Amino acid sequence: MTVKLVLPSLEYEQSYRDYIVELGDEERYPFQLDLEHNDFCALLERLDHFLNGVNIPSGYVPTSTFWLVDGHELVGVSSLRQYLNEAIAECGGHIGLGVRPSYRGLGLGNTLMAVTIQEARKIGIEEIHIHCHKSNEASGRMIVRNGGVLRSELKLGQHPETVQRYVLPAPNNSFKPKPLRGSA
C-alpha cells in the first residue's frame, strides 16, 4: 500500500461517497465528513471556503482538509485548524482525523496524523494542540507516538466524556550553539 496526502478533488468523488456509506451510523469525524455531499462540486467549494476562511460559520476557523489516499481510494480524512479560537482551544485542538472503517488497524491513523502535523509545521503552527476522548485509548496512544504530551483532562458540562488535551511542543530549531572562544 502506497498512501499520499492530497487536497480534496473531484477525482475522489466515488471513493468519498463509498467512505460515507461505509461509516453507516458511526459519528462522521472530522466534521467535514458530516457536510452535505449530494452536490459534490458544492462540497469541494465549501471545503475551499474553509481552507481560505471565506463564508465560514460563526465559531469556526479557517481549516485545511486533507485526504489520505491509496491510489484512487480515500482511506482517511484529516482537518487542520489554522489557528484556535477560545472554544476550540478549550476543546477541539488543531487536528482532527478519521480512518475509513475497512482500513483501520493498519497504522494509517498514525501516518495521517504524522503528515498532518508536518502540514501544521509548514504553516507556522509551533505548539500543536490535539484533543481526544479519554475513552478513545487508540487515539491517545497515537498522539503520544507522534510527540504529544498530555497537558490536561477536561469534563465539559453535561457531556459524559472526558476530553484529554495533548500538546506537541514547538520544535527546538532556534537553538544555535555559541562558537567556542578562539574558534573561527
Would you name each region that the model predicts?
Residues G96-V99, G105-Q118, K122, R141-R145:
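Conserved acetyl-CoA-binding loop-helix of GNAT-fold acetyltransferases
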Residues M1-H94, E119, P160-A184:
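GNAT-family acyltransferases
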Residues I130-A138:
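Conserved beta-strand-loop-alpha-helix junction that forms the acyl-donor binding cleft
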Residues A120-H131:
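Conserved GNAT acetyl-CoA-binding A-motif
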Residues R81-Y83, H94-G105, H133:
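A short, internal acetyl-CoA/4′-phosphopantetheine-binding micro-motif in the GNAT/acyltransferase core
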Residues H131-C132, G147-R165:
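Conserved catalytic-core motifs of GNAT/GCN5-like acyltransferases
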